[in-house]
Amino acid sequence: MQQEIELLGDERFESQNRETASERPAHSQSDEDLLDGYSRTVITAAEKVSPSVVYIEVEQPIRSRRPDAARTPPERRGSGSGFIFTPDGFILTNSHVVHGARKIEVTLSDGHKCQTDLIGDDPDTDLAVIRINAPNLVPAQLGDAQRIRVGQLVIAIGNPYGFQYSVTAGVVSALGRSLRAQSGRLMDAVIQTDAALNPGNSGGPLVNSRGEVIGVNTAMILPAQGICFATSIDTAKFVASRLIRDGKVSRSYIGLAGQNVPLPRRIVRYYDLAVASGIFVVSFEANSPARKSGLREGDIIIGFDDHPTAGIDDLHKLLTEERIGRQSSLAVIRGTDKLTIDVTPEESENRDHK
């Protein structure tokens, strides 16, 4: 915004001094030309991806704890955005837009409405895939997250507050951010942007100047201005492939509840530990891998398969699909002793435990 103010100030100064075009260096562009070029870039990118953007309306049952509640629960309506990414009707959106929905309806850019099948959703990355059956669909072109640079132009397209196909522009403010998903897990490799997002933008595409999707718009920080986030398209590609193949994203779990705690300094020094904190084991899920391993309440986990774990988020990142059924080792502080305990992670079923 400061740069924009300075540009406007320069225009006024030049106008007051009545500088003519002939007095300018031949190789320089006027501010008007630069702004026209910026506008053309945004317009071209938006026009390229707009046919792929969809408006999503959902109906979700409202659960009531009252015993006298009606047998047919009342419904809550919500909306969001998404985008077609395959010619045969697969659509990416946010998990929080469609999770638990009884009915999902998609409106295409031409106004055509389609009933929708939920293929799968992954609350841990706030991503979901739905599918429609319609002819002549235009899939968005997916970009490469490895080519994103801080400061580059990005355009967000969505349906804020039900106003369909709204376009905002900004820049990539930062890369590699972490954001807490509604499931409690930490999402990594998140893109921060100042392109304005509002309720209803969720699930829409964040595109570069070539109209390639580089992120899935997911969240904004309120009441802050200009702090919005998008899930990296590389993460979205991986999650979408798993949802289409399996209807879910498999992760491993060991079945414990814990909290992050600092380690006594003398323990850190004595064992020359790579971390100064760990995971204090509070409880276990019944018959869980952690319970069967011999781990005890009060133990402090400081490592998993030779990877330091300074906290629960570190352990979450390591409990991947590849570790399901494979024996792993936990580095543990018990009292003043350092132990190694073998554990075999099992497949997670969206449990609250780790």
Segments predicted by a language model, with ranges:
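Conserved PDZ fold ligand-binding element
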Residues: I91-L92, A290-I312
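A structural signal for beta-strand boundary/capping segments at domain termini and interdomain linkers
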Residues: K113, Q327, K338-T340
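Serine-dependent protease modules
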Residues: M1-S277, T320, T336, E347-K354
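Short, structured beta-strand/loop micro-motifs enriched in basic residues and often containing a Trp
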Residues: A134-P139, I279-E285, T309-D313
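C-terminal tail/sorting-segment detector
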Residues: D342-T344
